[in-house]
Amino acid sequence: MKKISLPKIGIRPVIDGRRMGVRESLEEQTMNMAKATAALLTEKLRHACGATVECVISDTCIAGMAEAAACEEKFSSQNVGLTITVTPCWCYGSETIDMDPTRPKAIWGFNGTERPGAVYLAAALAAHSQKGIPAFSIYGHDVQDADDTSIPADVEEKLLRFARAGLAVASMKGKSYLSLGGVSMGIAGSIVDHNFFESWLGMKVQAVDMTELRRRIDQKIYDEAELEMALAWADKNFRYGEDENNKQYQRNAEQSRAVLRESLLMAMCIRDMMQGNSKLADIGRVEESLGYNAIAAGFQGQRHWTDQYPNGDTAEAILNSSFDWNGVRKPFVVATENDSLNGVAMLMGHQLTGTAQVFADVRTYWSPEAIERVTGHKLDGLAEHGIIHLINSGSAALDGSCKQRDSEGNPTMKPHWEISQQEADACLAATEWCPAIHEYFRGGGYSSRFLTEGGVPFTMTRVNIIKGLGPVLQIAEGWSVELPKDVHDILNKRTNSTWPTTWFAPRLTGKGPFTDVYSVMANWGANHGVLTIGHVGADFITLASMLRIPVCMHNVEETKVYRPSAWAAHGMDIEGQDYRACQNYGPLYKR
């Protein structure tokens, strides 16, 4: 089967078409702008899979309808998923713009005095607004000389932010969400909304009963040699935590081995269901070898599976991590309890950063007063206003231990192409595997337990669906916090101490939902959230605007909010603009 190609970025150099001196004097400068833009994007960006981003430049500068059509024909054949139009001069607005209604698009008008690039930018954006095809504006803050081929820092920031978000849009389009099971314990996010995936993300939903997973395990529809490799890897790397079950529920060595074996098999089979596995065709399972073209998945687990079979904690944690028995590799996106909306937030974060995502319950707000009462410890530093306990038995990526290091030696989570085997081993060494608590998981299983290092910048996100409004996105930038060990132990033992923990302190603004830490917790729209490494809320905002998903809560500086230019026509308050524009334009893939 032919492999689906990755989306490319189309670069459209547009030009004043008047011959006999005007166009000729601009050809080189205009095409050089396109080449410089392509070089920047190719150097600075990668796809989430690690592949280099490719740019496709129009064969000629575009002065009118004929050349615009020729450019579009080329882009259509090259799988261009987003476009950037560049020009240093006046051109003919509506005659030269990209008219594809679903492809994200931006225009960079060169800020120079010799030719009016800004005038074209304004004229072209007016045409986009009038035609109902929003576009992003890129215009340098400072005037440049005509022969200056450099890309200013503010222009570079917008080019990269637009491209990251646009690539995420293009990468999701045409893929599927694998809904493995149904609704878990009444959790609304696991009531998978096909219309949301189709209309806003351009994706399909593949609904598969959990009996398909059982069938693959029981009928050995997997690579048996790989299973042996996985078991050997676990034997070498897994450290086991204490068994907190009552004696009558504790398993012997043989039973524990069977639970581990099935947990690893679940990881293999869910992966194969998502992306396919050619080795299955070798054993006569051609249909199963294809997979479901899934860019994200969710596993219901509770309770119809977990009451009799090992839970999905081990499988989900391994799949979401950037490494397994095959070494360092691209992380998958698998939502525990089939919370598809948290899965979408995970997918967004992964596409924007290329990193693994930390799925968690937004479990408890601990005020400074409560912590001092319970532990005698007075919070300070990042934690001085209180903290939120993020903890869940399921699919937190082991990368979330933050045992990887950036170029300055700081704890972080990195895209897989930057992770060394030593860093992967360090994440494994920081993780214990604790037998599942029988009262919750009668079929057994192992939950990963680690503690996220402190002082690491994170962005917490969540997608919710509101009847009558549609999807909304929540964003909270903040940091992980490290507590003294005795304080952590006291707090952690008040909940389930066999699960992974991140202590999170959101950045406060003193206003609205970010008045204090309690308000962040109180305004969070569901029981789950996602941690993405870095303060990348601005990228989420740009991506959400492309998909027409309003942001109902964020603490990103206003100067970093970057949305299509037409949003400015929807009022003077930028968050009200967002709601009105998203309602006006409707979902990106209107269905």
Curated annotation (Swiss-Prot):
**Active site per the UniProt annotation:** 337, 361
Q: Which domain of life is it from?
A: Bacteria
User: Which positions in this protein are listed as binding Mn(2+)?
Assistant: 337, 361, 528
The metabolic or biological pathway listed in the UniProt record of this protein is: Carbohydrate degradation; L-fucose degradation; L-lactaldehyde and glycerone phosphate from L-fucose: step 1/3
Q: What is its main location?
A: cytoplasm
List the SUPFAM superfamilies.
FucI/AraA C-terminal domain-like, FucI/AraA N-terminal and middle domains
* GO CC terms: cytoplasm
Q: Name the NCBIfam families on file.
A: fucI, PRK10991.1
Give the protein name, as stated in the record: L-fucose isomerase
